[in-house]
């Protein structure tokens, strides 16, 4: 279940920047950037470090999102996994284990950071205290959950030239998951079939 924890999961702005502590202004700025992408596709690289900075895992793959609440996250071999949501439930398929886990999608943004990119962004101010800084074409956000029942203590989200660039999730013991997005494309037509999953024959199914 490592991918669900990390997905439902940071570049720093260089040069002169202006910091904003007004939560309402930060919400408005973040909402405006997220609203630009009704669909999004990207390649990604993901690096997880422990509290001392030791590498725990490094992966790469392809991401597709469609608002509201649809996403597909495919991690390449040798740690291949496929994570899909149709907005109501989530499938996590591990071809090496020949196993798929099916869960109800937790709509709370603090439990599923991926919903920041694909879900109901009107709930952002309910879930997070937000600050941001802006310099040149870079906008960096820091999101702190307002409740303690969360997968992370801090979420950092950065945009460059209006496109999402990277995400960092830091948990209570200092473990960091850094996700860098590249080849980002927005508002292209996406086949709805990629956001559903047909269980292959012979695969074990676990309902949670």
From Swiss-Prot:
Keyword Transport appears in the UniProt entry: yes
Renumbered to this chain, the signal peptide range is 1-21
Q: What is its main location?
A: periplasm
Q: Which UniProt keywords apply?
A: Chaperone, Periplasm, Protein transport, Signal, Transport
GO BP terms: namely: lipoprotein localization to outer membrane; lipoprotein transport
Q: Does the record's keyword annotation contain Ion transport?
A: no
* A Pfam short name: LolA
Q: Which Gene3D superfamilies match?
A: Lipoprotein localisation LolA/LolB/LppX
Q: Subunit info?
A: Monomer.
Q: What does this protein do?
A: Participates in the translocation of lipoproteins from the inner membrane to the outer membrane. Only forms a complex with a lipoprotein if the residue after the N-terminal Cys is not an aspartate (The Asp acts as a targeting signal to indicate that the lipoprotein should stay in the inner membrane).
Q: Which family does it belong to?
A: Belongs to the LolA family.
What name does UniProt use for this protein? Outer-membrane lipoprotein carrier protein
Please name the gene that encodes this protein: lolA
